[in-house]
Amino acid sequence: MTAIIELNNLSVQFHQKGRLVTAVKNATLHIEKGDIYGVIGYSGAGKSTLVRTINLLQKPTEGQIVINGEKIFDSANPVKFTGAKLREFRQKIGMIFQHFNLLSEKTVFNNVAFALQHSQIEDKNGKKRYLTKKEKNDKVTELLKLVDLADLSDKYPAQLSGGQKQRVAIARALTNDPEILISDEGTSALDPKTTNQILDLLKSLHEKLGITVVLITHEMQVVKEIANKVAVMQNGEIIEQNSLIDIFAQPKEALTKQFIETTSSVNRFIASLSKTELLAQLADDEELIHLDYSGSELEDPVVSDITKKFDVTTNIFYGNVELLQGQPFGSLVLTLKGSSEHRAAAKAYFVERHLKFEVLGKIERTVD
């Protein structure tokens, strides 16, 4: 597919307290039309700065930006992109934030309508005109239905929950029919249940409207829920980017692995083993194995195969299967018991089958 967002070799620098700070360094990111693209990193990684260059809320120092085939910034060959042209361009990019930024003295309906006060459309002769009052009202009514707030249109922000406030913000961000929706930590202020509801809404809007979503977050669980692609940022640089499935199946960078571990129940289980009395120390002919597998591998009886082929026995302590982008991913923690030669043959079989595994070793009980 064609990239709707192209950020090429972008750097962003600014002066802070007498010193030059590089917030983004030589970052390249291409986002295709229809992606839900997660950009993840810890606080200060540069993810918000990078993504705010998409609509030029943050002007880069170096590099090139192409949005929907139109070059809007090029440090090597400056582009004149200001005034009315810039305002019109920004209307096609909606944004939501961690803080909802609603007008407290206006109702839900009027908070959304406020974003339409300068909106224009083309008439049948190709001339631009402002929306009529009826057109604005119809648009707001349609959007409130879309975000499931039709029955709260007369309420004020103080009467809403956090999730409802964010739904108002989303409706407001959609008023000018944007092709791109940026969520800058849009779920960070919400509890887990409400977070999932907002993520479900974003996914639904993506499907209904065909909108491209850019999701900035410090939580891998948020990315895991709805994104199809991921970029990981650290110290202003994109250190890894790939499809969600490939990131989870074969993470390359230590930071990426750390983020993935925060979403994995198998890692919590492994950590708990050192504090449990369920397992004594392993025998000399036993090893504890953590095995990951995905897709068609889940259909194959791998554990059964190794017990038959290599004269080893197994004892499964943990098993889990979940779906990522509709593809199953599974984890097992099991003991492998047998002679060193037979255990080595079983592990070689894992390698042959392209299964990801690690030897966890013996369990040593620890005390808190």
From Swiss-Prot:
State the oligomer form and interacting partners.
Answer: The complex is composed of two ATP-binding proteins (MetN), two transmembrane proteins (MetI) and a solute-binding protein (MetQ).
Task: Name the SMART domains on file.
Answer: AAA, NIL
Q: What does this protein do?
A: Part of the ABC transporter complex MetNIQ involved in methionine import. Responsible for energy coupling to the transport system.
What keywords tag this UniProt record? Answer: Amino-acid transport, ATP-binding, Cell membrane, Membrane, Nucleotide-binding, Translocase, Transport
Q: Which Pfam families match?
A: ABC_tran (PF00005), NIL (PF09383)
Give the protein family.
Belongs to the ABC transporter superfamily. Methionine importer (TC 3.A.1.24) family.
- EC number(s) recorded for this UniProt protein: 7.4.2.11
List, for all copies, the residue spans of the domain called ABC transporter: 5-260
This one is known as Methionine import ATP-binding protein MetN
Q: Where in the cell is it found?
A: Cell membrane
The keyword Transmembrane helix appears for this protein: no
Q: Which PANTHER family match?
A: AMINO ACID IMPORT ATP-BINDING PROTEIN, METHIONINE IMPORT ATP-BINDING PROTEIN METN
Major location (coarse): membrane
Q: Does the keyword section mention Metal-binding? A: no
- Uppermost EC category: translocase
Native organism taxonomy: Bacteria, Bacillati, Bacillota, Bacilli, Lactobacillales
What's any one GO cellular component for it?
A: plasma membrane
The UniProt GO MF terms for this protein read: ABC-type D-methionine transporter activity; ATP binding; ATP hydrolysis activity
Q: What catalytic activity does the UniProt entry give for this protein?
A: L-methionine(out) + ATP + H2O = L-methionine(in) + ADP + phosphate + H(+); D-methionine(out) + ATP + H2O = D-methionine(in) + ADP + phosphate + H(+)
Residues at which ATP binds? 41-48
Task: Kindly give the membrane topology term recorded for this protein.
Answer: Peripheral membrane protein
Out of the domains of life, which is the source?
Bacteria
Q: Which residues form a coiled coil?
A: none
